Amino acid sequence: MRVVLAGGGTAGHVEPALALADALRRINPDTQVLCLGTKRGLEQRLVPMRGYELAEIPAVPLPRKLTPQLLSVPGRLANAISTAAKHLDRVQADILVGFGGYVATPGYLAARSRRIPIVVHEANPLPGLANRLGARLTPHVFTGHPHTEIRNGRYIGIPLRTRISNLDRLAVGDKARSKFGLRPDLPTLLIFGGSQGAQAINQAAFDSAEDFYQAGIQVLHVVGPKNADGPEDRTRGGVPYVVVPYVDEMELAYAAADIAMCRSGALTCAELTAVGLPAVFVPLAIGNGEQRLNAEPIVQAGGGLMVANSELSRDWIREHLIPLLTDTDRIVAMSEAAARLGRRDADMALAREVIAIARGERPTPEMPIDYSEESGDTR
């Protein structure tokens, strides 16, 4: 089977696509995978690193408002569609799976022009423009959030790397802490802000360094590649404050931590619940509040806290986060609550759907594919 994946720009688009690719290869090692991407997205690094072919197509941002940029969209979009179609023809694609982002729209339209089956995966509660368009071109639409309102949508979860979905935090916790230069006997806070970091989170954490030292809380702080500054004295009284620009093995960062403080993108929320790591969510106030909607079910279930970006401060951390990190029983309860919301099998579930659709065996809503272990998924 020859599969083309269209999803680039951010980790939230790229990582689920690659997790699906891995699952398809586990089912059939002969599956051919081509990823469509842009010149500037994270896919430039992640796709080759994971062993897949990347084909570039022009990025075509769709303006949300009436601006002069709208005049250039038809010509640029036509060029991107033509480029995507050439790649589909070159690999003789059997199916295209889109995950949103700038490359998804040309991918959907190119596949439609070639009568190639289309699958849409929308990770967020509020679907983006590209996937709303894609959902009009196919009945095969799957969502990462149970309450996403999109045409033909069926909840399936967000595909995750097996390093995340198979992670046993307790089993590898001490090894993970040793890797990052952390002690095995102290409560541990993991701070990160997504692939590029988050200035507000970084600053509030740095401002609170003295409070973490005094409370005996060690910190693993992933600041982002452009934000390598941090407390000058990073270990005090034997309490580490480890600052790193980026972590490729994020599963080890999760294993090292008792609690995370982070943004609440759809992929982040899916990973944290899959591994049962409670979090303080600091939603990025963008778009229609997608990040807040991602975190709300976890917070309501008792698996996390949420604070507005504008309200995060040293005082808030001192009042809410530090007492939590020193309350072992509460951390255990929050971890269990988060884990109850996690879905670890979405990669295999979506892979089976893609295979069935490519073969013309799409199940109806009344006769869904059985994703239980009895159906052959024995990971």
From Swiss-Prot:
Annotated membrane-spanning segments are none
Reaction equation(s) it catalyzes:
di-trans,octa-cis-undecaprenyl diphospho-N-acetyl-alpha-D-muramoyl-L-alanyl-D-glutamyl-meso-2,6-diaminopimeloyl-D-alanyl-D-alanine + UDP-N-acetyl-alpha-D-glucosamine = di-trans,octa-cis-undecaprenyl diphospho-[N-acetyl-alpha-D-glucosaminyl-(1->4)]-N-acetyl-alpha-D-muramoyl-L-alanyl-D-glutamyl-meso-2,6-diaminopimeloyl-D-alanyl-D-alanine + UDP + H(+)
Enzyme Commission number(s)? 2.4.1.227
Sites binding UDP-N-acetyl-alpha-D-glucosamine sit at 10-12, 124, 161, 195, 291
Keywords of this protein's UniProt record, alphabetized? Cell cycle, Cell division, Cell membrane, Cell shape, Cell wall biogenesis/degradation, Glycosyltransferase, Membrane, Peptidoglycan synthesis, Transferase
Q: Where in the cell is it found?
A: Cell membrane
The family note in this entry says: Belongs to the glycosyltransferase 28 family. MurG subfamily.
Provide the function of this protein: Cell wall formation. Catalyzes the transfer of a GlcNAc subunit on undecaprenyl-pyrophosphoryl-MurNAc-pentapeptide (lipid intermediate I) to form undecaprenyl-pyrophosphoryl-MurNAc-(pentapeptide)GlcNAc (lipid intermediate II).
From the Swiss-Prot or TrEMBL record, give the protein name.
UDP-N-acetylglucosamine--N-acetylmuramyl-(pentapeptide) pyrophosphoryl-undecaprenol N-acetylglucosamine transferase
What broad taxonomic lineage does this protein's source fall under?
Bacteria, Bacillati, Actinomycetota, Actinomycetes, Streptosporangiales
Gene symbol here is murG
